[in-house]
Amino acid sequence: MLGLDTPHDHHGGARRGRNTVRQFTFGALRVVHMGDIGCVPDETTLAALRGCDALLIPVGGYYTVGAEEALAIAESIAPRCIVPMHYRGEGFGFDVLGTVGEFTALFDAASVHTLGGDTFTLTADAPRGVIVPRLLHFV
């Protein structure tokens, strides 16, 4: 596992502290979890993550990057699949967060794969694009 230190905000971490981006390697598969990233990372960080198989990235904004910045990060890293996280949905999430639809609307509809369940298996032949699992939430 690789951990990369990044600021959590646009002020070098002065407002929200630091964030750790984690890269996990499972055989030939690389999975990147962006944590609570709140700004576009520097080029050195982006280069270390480039070409990963799966990118888990917040898209809801306010506490983290929003849809547009998440897209910019994803385009720079160029993962095989993107899994959005930290957003508001029907019946869950903070009112200040954007929805997953605000992020997926930035992509061609054919590249957005909405799942019927909350899990999927990442394989070498998994579909490219945005993977949106059905989220479980508790009231």
Show which residues each predicted segment covers.
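Short histidine/acidic/glycine/proline-rich micro-motifs that form metal-
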Residues: 8, 61-62, 88-93
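Charged helix-capping and loop-helix junction motifs
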Residues: 16-17, 50, 66-78, 96-100
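Glycine-rich loops and low-complexity Gly/Arg-rich segments
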Residues: 24-27, 48-49, 57-59, 80-83, ...
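Proline-aspartate-enriched helix->loop->beta-strand connector
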Residues: 53-57, 61, 67-88
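Binuclear metal-ion centers of metallo-dependent hydrolases, dominated by the metallo-beta-lactamase
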Residues: 81-139
